[in-house]
Amino acid sequence: MYGHHGYPMHAHQQQMVNPTLAIVDNKMHTLSTFLNYIRAYRDPLRISKDLKETFHLFPNLSPFYENIPNRVNLICIKGTIPICFKGINYYLPIIVWVPLNYPQEFPTMVLDPTPEMRIVKNHHHVNLQGLVYHPYISSWSSNSTMETRVSQQQQPQPPQNNISPPPYGSSPTNNNVAAQQQQPPPPYGSSPSTSNSSSYTQPPPSYDSIKNKTNNTSSLPPPKQPQTSPPPPPTQQQQQQQNNNIIPPPQQPSPPPAYTEPTAAKQQQQQTSPSVKPLPPLPPQPVIDKKSEMVDQCTIKLQELLSKFYDTTSLEIKDFEAHNKSLEELSKKKLLEKEELSNQLATYNSQIDQLNENIEQLEKWINENDKSDSNIDIDQILGPKDSLSKQLLKLVSDDSTIEDLLYYLDKALHSNRISLEEYLKNVRSLSRDQFIIRATVKKVQFIIRQNQQQLQQQQQQQNSPQRQQYNQQQYFSK
């Protein structure tokens, strides 16, 4: 396991401090807030439970967030995990991405090397991009846990350095250093020892075969941040207690670690560094409060119910708003129709009043002219009423009379009843009278025609408002 900046650390100095309950609760509070904010995960309770156990088992892991646009919001935990190889412990910086369908889909683990580290080529479990593959993925199920997935990376792996890493804080002899320098590292892809090969005969699947199974978020980790120094390592007793809690992985050949040290100067510096005294043992870890876990679960459940209630209520409110808008439009239409009906009602009432007046006038005239047949004077009834009509009737009758006289005088002349002198004398006199009568008839007709035109104009002026009202009624009815 690599320590700060990838330097190897000795086992007795790898004392990882167990986090207190307050630190774990703080991390879980941050994750719960994030889960309630995005509301995208299928099983947030299972995620909270597994992450809490992971934080207890690996205190160096912490939630990591980064505001990156146009990317799915996924939970990410970042930190270092310890591995032990040949009595030397190393800290490996990793990033773990939790998919949306967890635990149906396995989490994605990516190595996060510092600038001083490099990834070994053709590694069995790590590609050049840092994506980690482990045989535990091939057997992943919904019952698998995240802390077991991370624990698989703690298995001993032989380092692939040009010089074997010395124990941190110790000053080995020159013979040991020379022996270490002369001992070549195991080549990549070399077969493991006989004891290991008997327990794991089938090699793990390649990275290309498992790459298709991972989701899109596994190949797009967020930008890296500077690696922070790990917390103090735990004591040997605490390390042994943690190892007892870890689920043992299946036996397999140990591939080389993903990182190698670029220079040997840092290794010499570690060899010459003085030994560091182990830290005193820490007090026992406090008991986890189950009541707080239940409160957190209840809070998450209530927030889910509130979210569902908010969604359904918002949809109902939108439906009610649309219904209210339609009702307002209908009310406006009803008001317009009511105004039109009131105007039509006023017009019809005025017409009814006018018809009643006409009916009264007709009844009055009928009562006045209701007489018996014996008292009726036909000449008075059928004769003209005004003086001009009477004069015109008399003139027309005189003109017809003169026409008859001229006709009979003409017949008397042909039958030799009268002489020619008498005929001419009578014709001259009657013609003069007929001319005067006809001229008077034309004057009387002209005066009567003028009176009729004036009467028609007066009637038209009286009927024009009624016609306008009638036209308006016809227009609105259309």
Swiss-Prot record:
SUPFAM superfamilies: Endosomal sorting complex assembly domain, UBC-like. It is found in: Cytoplasm; Membrane; Nucleus; Late endosome membrane. Component of the ESCRT-I complex (endosomal sorting complex required for transport I). Its main location: cytoplasm. This is ESCRT-I complex subunit tsg101. Residues 144-290, 458-478 are annotated as: Disordered. InterPro entries: ESCRT-I_UEV_domain, ESCRT_assembly_dom, SB_dom, UBQ-conjugating_enzyme/RWD, UEV_N. The gene is tsg101. GO terms for molecular function: ubiquitin binding. One of its GO terms (cellular component) is late endosome membrane.
